[in-house]
């Protein structure tokens, strides 16, 4: 498959210009060069509030599983849609199986992401983030010189629509990387469309109302090095909810680390081997008027094993707006109408800190 690239319209290109992240040390290189790290070396990564909430055992809550094939079947769609409604309302998070993405597409993207992060630092730095851009290799949400840092490196790419791509950020090594990203991006975009159709059904609204809520896509490929010194004191990603409409995540290897916050406690997520993970984003919470909740989540670090993942963030038109959809005339509006650009700029201008960005959209007194 030939990878598409185009010059792009101003709106599409502006998506990646909504924020920036200050340059900081590469964590993978830090681990490789320092061996057993001292407290002084990783002081900026130590999270003081990491134990503020209890961590429950894995079996404390079974993450909902949604079978896409049941949603597509007339005989089972109603029952499966009820499960989807429950998952979005009570969890803001679910696993999706029989998602339709070919095994070879998933295998290829997993292999190429692993190969990319194994490349020498100087090769990866050829795709480093540039000031004023969200794309590229580096870190994210670093907005001050004194904030605590996350124990991870990443590469972020704007993938859909193709007019918004900047191919200078797309790695040429391994030589199959671009093609793997292209195929995976298209397949996940189709999955996001299917899920949005059924999410609309669960909200009793016309699918057309959600048709423009996944027109743009960012991919973020994350690498979480092991931390032998004090893995319980650092985080791969700080607690946050996503500023997207819908996020779809694929675990690259079998190393766990993702935790979701539910009922005030952290629940470790152990995905099914055949599942993708889906979480409600802030924009869907706003649009549903709080019926569906964006999930707060974080990533913990393993003492001896690396962890890798790829997240696909689906967002509406850059120039669009998100307004709460009220089910009845008596329903009280909990969120104000927000511009997509307006919310995105706010989200990317701050460090990750729970669901703080969403407070901006809540109406006063709520």
Protein language model features and the residues they cover:
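Peripheral, non-catalytic segments flanking oxidoreductase cores
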Residues: 1-366
């Amino acid at each position: 498959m030939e990878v598409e690239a185009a010059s792009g319209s101003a709106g599409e290109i502006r998506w990646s210009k909504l924020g920036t992240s200050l340059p900081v040390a590469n964590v993978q290189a830090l681990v490789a060069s320092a061996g057993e790290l001292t407290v002084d070396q990783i002081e900026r990564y130590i999270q003081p509030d990491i134990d503020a909430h209890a961590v429950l055992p894995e079996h404390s809550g079974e993450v909902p599983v949604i079978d896409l094939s049941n949603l597509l079947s007339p005989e089972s769609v109603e029952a499966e849609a009820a499960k989807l409604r429950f998952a979005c309302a009570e969890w803001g998070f679910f696993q999706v199986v029989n998602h339709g993405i070919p095994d070879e597409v998933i295998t290829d993207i997993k292999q190429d992401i692993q190969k990319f992060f194994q490349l020498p630092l100087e090769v990866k730095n050829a795709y480093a983030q540039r000031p004023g851009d969200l794309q590229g290799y580096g870190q994210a949400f670093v907005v001050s010189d004194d904030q605590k840092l996350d124990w991870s490196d990443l590469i972020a790419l704007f993938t859909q629509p193709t007019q918004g791509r900047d191919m200078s950020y797309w790695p040429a090594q391994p030589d199959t990387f671009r093609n793997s990203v292209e195929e995976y991006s298209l397949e996940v975009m189709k999955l996001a469309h299917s899920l949005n159709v059924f999410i609309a059904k669960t909200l009793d609204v016309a699918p057309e109302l959600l048709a423009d809520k996944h027109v743009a896509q960012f991919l973020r490929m994350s690498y979480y090095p092991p931390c032998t010194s004090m893995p319980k004191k650092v985080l791969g990603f700080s607690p946050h909810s996503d500023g997207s409409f819908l996020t779809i995540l694929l675990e690259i290897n079998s190393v766990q680390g993702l935790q979701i916050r539910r009922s005030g406690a952290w629940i470790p997520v152990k995905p099914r081997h055949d599942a993708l993970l889906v979480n409600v984003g802030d924009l869907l919470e706003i649009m549903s008027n709080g019926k569906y909740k964006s999930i707060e989540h974080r990533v913990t670090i393993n003492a001896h094993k690396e962890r890798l993942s790829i997240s696909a963030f689906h967002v509406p038109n850059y120039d669009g707006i998100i307004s709460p959809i009220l089910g009845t005339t008596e329903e009280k509006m909990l969120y104000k109408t927000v511009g997509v650009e307006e919310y995105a700029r706010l989200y990317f201008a701050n460090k990750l800190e729970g669901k703080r960005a969403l407070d901006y959209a809540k109406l006063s007194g709520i």
